[in-house]
């Protein structure tokens, strides 16, 4: 239902008025419930390009039609609005896809990279200063000492996010690092070592501090924040509600101890 105004333009204006950047969040592969309005409309437009998994629709990651469609959407947003970035979410194979267990993952990575390349080229052709980013699965791959427990970006869901940085298809990564201890620290360092001079901003699972989730203590998050700062990495929070609600005192910690002074957004020196 239309809110009666341009919601994206409103968000851009309010962010820029406060000295903040606005990155348009684009959900790529999932298209909602199979019988939902949005999924139904897409199925009419591209009947053979929407696949059904457990009652939900997904763009087929293996077709050029998917790459072209998503690239057109991102290009339209870039052309029409004064955005600072395009952020791709769920830019991966659906983990519930049965085919993932038997398919060639090299081919899968090529398919996802083809989509990312199509989007990046369209966006950069229009406005080279617009930042391309995505939120890959929190562990890129196994490290020399630590196993990813079968859940990583590179192999499990065919996200070769490091290659996207290397090849200039992405400017920033926001890996979903909703972990603790040895599931966090070595893998955060691994992202840094593979960053190719680009920006890596690990996302922290502050929602796990909620008693309704895993009831993590604040110290788990503050240790991670200290580690990231000491290693020259940024940080993001998932999700904002738990930050603004000051869950376990995270907002007060950030305001009074971690972020005492304004910080500048890192420049894209490679552009």
Regions found by a protein language model. Name each.
Residues 1-13, 17, 23-80:
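Active-site-adjacent "subsite" loops/lids of carbohydrate-active enzymes
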Residues 1-5, 53-71, 101-111, 170-180, ...:
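The substrate-binding groove and active-site-proximal loops of carbohydrate-active enzymes
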Residues 12, 16-35, 87-88, 108-154, ...:
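Aromatic-lined carbohydrate-recognition surfaces of secreted/lumenal glycan-active proteins
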Residues 15, 70, 77, 86-89, ...:
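Conserved, mostly hydrophobic/aromatic
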Residues 30-54, 91-106, 145-152:
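Aromatic- and acidic-residue-enriched segments that line the glycan-binding/catalytic groove
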Residues 64-80, 150-167, 184-188, 215-227:
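Short, acidic/polar
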Residues 126, 131-174, 179-190, 211:
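Substrate-binding cleft/loops of secretory-pathway carbohydrate-active enzymes
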Residues 161-184, 198-270:
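Substrate-binding cleft of secreted/luminal carbohydrate-active enzymes
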């Amino acid at each position: 239902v239309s809110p009666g105004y341009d919601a994206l333009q409103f968000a851009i204006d309010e962010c820029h008025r406060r000295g903040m950047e606005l990155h348009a969040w684009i959900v790529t592969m999932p298209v909602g419930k199979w019988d939902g309005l949005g999924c139904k409309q897409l199925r009419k437009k591209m009947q053979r390009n929407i696949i059904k998994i457990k009652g939900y629709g997904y763009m087929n990651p293996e077709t050029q039609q998917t790459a072209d469609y998503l690239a057109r959407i991102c290009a339209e947003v870039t052309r029409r609005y004064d955005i600072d970035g395009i952020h791709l979410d769920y830019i991966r194979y659906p983990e519930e896809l049965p085919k993932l267990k038997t398919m060639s993952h090299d081919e899968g990575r090529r398919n996802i990279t083809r989509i990312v390349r199509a989007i990046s080229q369209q966006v950069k052709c229009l406005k080279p200063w617009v930042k391309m980013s995505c939120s890959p699965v929190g562990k890129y791959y196994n490290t020399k000492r630590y196993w990813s427990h079968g859940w990583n970006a590179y192999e499990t869901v065919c996200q070769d996010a490091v290659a996207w940085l290397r090849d200039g298809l992405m400017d920033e990564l926001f890996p979903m690092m909703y972990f603790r201890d040895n599931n966090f620290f070595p893998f955060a360092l691994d992202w840094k070592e593979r960053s190719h001079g680009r920006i890596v901003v690990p996302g922290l699972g502050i929602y796990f501090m909620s008693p309704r989730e895993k009831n993590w203590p604040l110290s788990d998050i503050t240790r991670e924040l200290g580690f990231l700062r000491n290693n020259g990495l940024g940080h993001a929070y998932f999700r904002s509600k738990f930050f603004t609600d000051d869950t376990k005192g995270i907002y007060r910690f950030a305001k009074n101890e971690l972020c005492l002074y304004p910080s500048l957004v890192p420049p894209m020196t490679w552009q």
